[in-house]
């Protein structure tokens, strides 16, 4: 997560540093939590949503929490082949992240909205017109 944060700040600017190491550890550990040796989350969308939710809400970094949260989510989705190689609908993702940061949605709703964004994005990628959009 620290590497993602450093890349976000290098690309977009902002103050470096961790405000609270324990909150950062908590945000990273939550999606990896287990009970009796079994992961509490196994669905990749739910795990990506948890990274987005906890990194965004815990505000462990001095600056760039929302950007880092979204980047972590997108990196996780991409590493699980759930993020097509195309332009993301920026306005929808921005609204989504701002809602998470403003406590307008809980973790379950974060998962539902992420699932909707990813499925909507996948449908757009499969549409007959997507090849035209992607070739321009």
What kind of feature is each model-predicted range?
Residues 1-136:
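FIC/Doc superfamily catalytic core
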